Amino acid sequence: MIDSDGFRANVGIIICNRSGQVMWARRFGQHSWQFPQGGVDEGESAEEAMYRELYEEVGLRPEHVQILASTRSWLRYRLPKRLIRQDSKPVCIGQKQKWFLLQLKSSENAIDLNACGHPEFDDWRWVSYWYPVRQVVSFKRDVYRKVMKEFAPTTLPLQVKESNHKRRGMRRN
């Protein structure tokens, strides 16, 4: 769905583990890494689109995750001119995104990049929370920064809990 301003409705998905690290995925056949994301279909809510994209891109189902947060508003980024398809109607100049922060409840073995037979990603890894802001393609950085800042109060306490848990397990002689 492309709105009257030329922005395509889209959902972005940040999956964190119990340590507060986030899933970082490499686009199939490319050297670029990003969070899972995808378009919102006509008549579909943002949450419905998120669950559909979650399965299509990383093979996870609703029972594998828990929604921790979603962005208060839609965030936009413009595509560089070289990526705008002028021959398509209506012309899409960028994306407007509703973001979801999910916590993986199941084993990471549930992640299946080939769940739908046409993978969007060919590799993934856990990275530190702020890592994606510096590493994502430049035209998405502002949105990533805003999303990560908004979700930080929810995610960063997970890192503190994990750190405290590890400390309690250490013994001094």
UniProtKB/Swiss-Prot annotation:
UniProt KW Hydrolase keyword: yes
InterPro entries membership: Nudix_hydrolase, NUDIX_hydrolase-like_dom_sf, NUDIX_hydrolase_CS, NUDIX_hydrolase_dom, RppH
Gene Ontology annotations for the cellular component aspect, listed alphabetically: cytoplasm
Motif (Nudix box): 38-59
Domain of life of the organism encoding this protein: Bacteria
Family: Belongs to the Nudix hydrolase family. RppH subfamily.
Protein name: RNA pyrophosphohydrolase
Organism listed in the record: Shewanella piezotolerans (strain WP3 / JCM 13877)
